[in-house]
From Swiss-Prot:
Its EC number is 2.4.1.21. It is an enzyme of class 2 (transferase). Belongs to the glycosyltransferase 1 family. Bacterial/plant glycogen synthase subfamily. Synthesizes alpha-1,4-glucan chains using ADP-glucose. It comes from Nitratidesulfovibrio vulgaris (strain DP4). It catalyses: [(1->4)-alpha-D-glucosyl](n) + ADP-alpha-D-glucose = [(1->4)-alpha-D-glucosyl](n+1) + ADP + H(+). Pathway: Glycan biosynthesis; glycogen biosynthesis. This is Glycogen synthase. The gene is glgA. Pfam families: Glyco_transf_5, Glycos_transf_1.
Length: 489
């Protein structure tokens, strides 16, 4: 039996998704699978799991999840996703809920218990299936204990001797930080409770444990890997990251162009390509009509924002400068939800500038596609951005971004006025700098249509493919001395 790369994740599109993590885990494993790498994914069986297009079946019943004090069982279901197995850990008391991590009251009180269980259940499933993986690849705090458990299992269990671990950090700010008493019930050995392990200012930090014990740690862009080594972006973990700097790598995410491409997008009223951009203008007119914007905006630039309405995404900067933008006779579309104060303010501005500003406090996948296609300029004023996917989508849709020069935004946007420019960036994450960059974009759109069309075509030619990212991960696995696909014992 060939040894697999097994991905551990709390989300995987199309089965579950709350943000970019789900998109990545819906694409990267599949890219490796299509490259001939034996690959599997393990994820929770949520109460609102979307399985209509991929029927699931019970594959393991009463899988015993070993805890020091008592065995707990779970059932495991399986789906065939384009020929790749996806396993779903089912235990109703932990995962049969409307939302993944929180509800309107806040984070679920038992999140630590839920995801400690998931990590242990994944390892129990691998034992039950009888074949140790070549690589266990965990993602974010929810699965960060997989590398930690593996580190200690390898010291005494021959089954795991040749398995290596990778932890990918999608957003360092979310760490899974819990009360110290929960460490005692996690099943990690006492020696893991140290300043170089799972302990963080007296708390149990799941992500820190993964960083400490994974064989390799990656982030989702090269720039973010460098940024988190310092206190400005390190979220308190820059110390442990500097200690593990030799194991830290930045690998840029890809974009799923099977889903996000204006030449084959089923959500668009008209498709278009770099050689035939007429359809983009038609998408713009259709979007203006759909959202009830003033028809004259068909002849003016429309600025689109898609993202969580939270401080990290810089929505407050956009709301601060929006009245000033209205003086330039532009349209603004905001799609997202998040902080209630930001939501209310965005809705108030829509009322104040009815017909020129549209705020949709929700997220729908189809409308996101139409905003990418129908906007002229895409706004992404993030205070930090580990990678970012929406700017990659904007580039492919010929909607040059205006973005902060941080993290993955720095790695994916060539800033104007370079002859190879694909968008606009600004250095200081503040309202004045953001406004200047937007006005530069509006000026170019208005006064130099030929230069603008050149930028649009260059943007659409960018190719941040998952195959490229997959090859980078295969190189990383090779550094660990493992070759997925080799026959196991």
């Amino acid at each position: 039996m060939q040894r697999q790369v097994v991905f551990a994740t709390s989300e995987m599109y199309p089965f579950s998704k709350s943000g970019g993590l789900g998109d990545v885990l819906g694409a990267l494993p599949l890219a490796l699978h299509r490259m001939g790498v034996p690959t599997a994914v393990v994820t929770p069986f949520y109460g609102r799991l979307r399985t209509a297009d991929y029927p699931i079946r019970l594959t393991v019943s009463d899988c015993h999840v070993g805890y020091p004090w008592a065995p707990i069982t779970c059932d495991v279901f399986e789906a065939d996703y384009h020929g790749m197995p996806v396993y779903f850990i089912h235990r109703g008391e932990y995962f049969d809920r409307r939302y993944y991590y929180n509800d309107h009251k806040g984070d679920y009180f038992d999140n630590c218990e839920r995801f400690v269980f998931f990590c242990r259940a994944l390892l129990a499933l691998m034992r039950r299936l009888g074949q140790p993986p070549a690589v266990l690849h965990a993602h974010d705090w929810q699965t960060a204990l997989v590398p930690a458990f593996l580190y200690f299992l390898r010291q005494g269990d021959p089954f795991w001797q040749d398995t290596r671990s990778v932890l990918t950090i999608h957003n360092l700010a979310f760490q899974g930080r819990f009360a110290s008493r929960l460490f005692e019930t996690s099943g990690l050995p006492p020696q893991a409770w140290s300043v170089d392990g799972a302990e963080f200012w007296g708390d149990f930090n799941l992500l820190k444990a993964g960083i400490a014990y994974a064989d390799k740690v990656t982030t989702v862009s090269p720039s973010y890997a460098r940024e988190i080594l310092g206190p400005a972006y390190g979220s308190g973990l820059d110390g442990i990251l500097r200690k593990r700097a030799h194991a830290l790598h930045g690998i840029l995410n890809g974009a799923d162009y099977d889903i996000w491409s204006p030449g084959n997008d089923r959500f668009l009223p008209c498709r278009y390509t770099p050689t035939d951009l007429a359809g983009k203008a038609q998408c713009k007119r259709a979007l203006i009509e759909e959202l009830g914007l003033d028809p004259h905006l068909a002849r003016r630039p429309i600025l689109g924002f898609i993202g969580r309405l939270r401080g990290q995404k810089g929505i407050d900067l956009l709301l601060d400068i929006l009245p000033r933008l209205m003086e330039s006779d532009v349209g603004v579309i905001i799609l997202g939800e998040g902080n209630l104060t930001h939501e209310a303010r965005a809705l108030e501005l829509m009322e104040a500038y009815r017909g020129r500003v549209c705020t949709i406090v929700s997220y729908t996948e189809d409308l996101a596609h139409r905003i990418q296609a129908g906007s002229d300029i895409f706004l992404m004023p993030s205070r930090y951005e580990p990678c970012g996917l929406t700017q990659m989508y904007a580039l492919r849709y010929g909607t040059p971004p205006v973005a902060t020069a941080v993290g993955g935004l720095r790695d994916t946007i060539v800033p104007w006025p370079s002859p190879e420019s694909t968008g606009f960036t600004f250095g200081r994450c503040e309202s004045a700098a953001f406004l200047r960059a937007i006005l530069d974009a509006v000026h170019l759109w208005t006064t130099a249509p030929g230069d603008w069309q050149g930028m649009v075509r260059r943007a659409m030619a960018q190719a941040f493919t998952w195959e490229r990212a997959g090859r980078a991960y295969l190189d990383l696995y090779a550094q660990l001395g493992v070759s997925p696909g080799e026959e196991g014992a």
